[in-house]
């Protein structure tokens, strides 16, 4: 409103009296003029209008007319947001006036939800909103004056708005709020509503006893875990709203345990699983390798929930140690480290001589000397070792092979096989052992004894055959004498002389003297005296793993046959034509004695 309107408000509202009371008629020259200077007069006060231009200046007295106070009404006086239409009515006795509307002492700014009648006396709010609540007034105005009605209040009911449940003592984790077991938690439901709402709380499908917008639970346990709901209701709007909040109670953490999928782990196996076992449910899991956080890779992979560690292509250096840690925002607990036992090998097999570390392929050793061979291979668990000699059925078990006294029979190729029963693998290698020393007869003592016995047996058979022939030839002359009488006078032949000698054609020269044997040769078995045998190791050295009680490759025992004693049945007074044959090495002797 400008300055001119303000002046008019004070002055143009003054009405001059329609008739002037004068006691005399003023001369024609007299004129009624208004002083341009503002008068210090207020509304409804008497105003003095001076008349200038006459010798006597009479005074004219008048009074301004007041505007009537308008009245206001609303229908309905209480409205529901987004539902009702509200109409305001302004009534006044004055005419030739304009109506202005005021809300909360401010001129109303009209918008699309409002309608105004042509005379301005009816104001309609088509769809009422909560911001339409407040006091309303109408004001009647003319050129100089205005008059405002008493205020009227519009009550707009609304709500409840969407409910938000807050937990003061919890920690949000996504859509879940976590609280520690044993602590306290306070719930608060926030919403906007007029009039205030009624609150109903639920835990799962159970109705709680709390009916206010806030409540507290002390000493929280796992029983207090779940989905909380708050139902707010407005009895005026007949509307309701439901808010939800999921609460997770974090229990006191216990130590987890790392459990492998198998205890018999073998190198190069396809995979092995390590599981972090814990009785706690709502926890996070983190893995550690050798005390440091584990970094996943193609070789070490984690499951979606981090509770399983998968080791692909198990290697011997994947022993760990491994540990897992369970945690929440309130506490942590880590397992004891687990060291894996991974079986592998055997790797390449090595044969060394005694305590030497260099691998050898050929060994020369003196005859009758001792020899120690060591076989080893990298393996877990330790490998089992088996020794064999080429072209021999004997075997020896253990890392070490000890030969106390080398003989010619120990010469050859020795094989050592290392095996691992858990991995199912075996590897072997060999070494050539050459026994060197002074050469002896190519025949063993047993072979020589056999040859001697064979020769003597042939001699014995030949002697018996010669004796038989001699007897037969000796009997032939007597038959001729009986048949031919001319022989009866012949002289007897002395005992020293033999009437008939076998011809050189019937006996070989070697057996020409057998005819002198008078009697049958008898063969007797003579038991040899007890001789000490060659001594071998009967107990493996302490380095042997199995402690076998047999010695490696004991040479086959020499065939010991009882000695033959050839006893002649010829007369004792006949001179012996054979000497005693003694073979000291096999302790076998043969004696041929002539008959007496």
From Swiss-Prot:
Disulphide-bonded residues: 90-138, 276-324, 375-416
Composition skew (Low complexity), residue ranges: 501-510
Glycan-carrying positions: 96, 105, 280, 306, 317, 368, 415
Record GO biological process: immune system process; positive regulation of cytokine production; regulation of immune system process; response to bacterium; signal transduction
Residue span(s) of domain Ig-like C2-type: 58-154, 160-246, 256-341, 346-432
Protein's name in the database: Cell adhesion molecule CEACAM20
Modified residues (Phosphotyrosine): 578, 589
Biased composition (Pro residues): 553-562
Subunit and partners: Interacts (via extracellular domain) with PTPRH (via extracellular domain); the interaction dephosphorylates CEACAM20. Interacts (phosphorylated form) with SYK (via SH2 domains); the interaction further enhances CEACAM20 phosphorylation.
Family (UniProt): Belongs to the immunoglobulin superfamily. CEA family.
PTM comment: Phosphorylated on tyrosine residues by SYK, SRC and FYN in vitro.
Region (Disordered): 477-510, 527-563
GO molecular function term, any single one: protein tyrosine kinase binding
PROSITE patterns: IG_LIKE
Name of the gene this protein is made from: CEACAM20
GO CC, one annotated term: apical plasma membrane
Membrane-spanning intervals of the chain: 451-471
Extracellular topological domain residue ranges: 31-450
Compartments in which it is found: Cell projection, Microvillus membrane; Apical cell membrane
Keywords: Cell membrane, Cell projection, Disulfide bond, Glycoprotein, Immunity, Immunoglobulin domain, Membrane, Phosphoprotein, Repeat, Signal, Transmembrane, Transmembrane helix
Classification via InterPro entries: Ig-like_dom, Ig-like_dom_sf, Ig-like_fold, Ig_sub, Ig_sub2, IgSF_CEA-related
Topological domain ranges for the Cytoplasmic compartment: 472-585
Membrane-related topology note: Single-pass type I membrane protein
Function noted in UniProt: Together with the tyrosine-protein kinase SYK, enhances production of the cytokine CXCL8/IL-8 via the NFKB pathway and may thus have a role in the intestinal immune response.
Signal peptide interval: 1-30
CDD domains: Ig (cd00096)
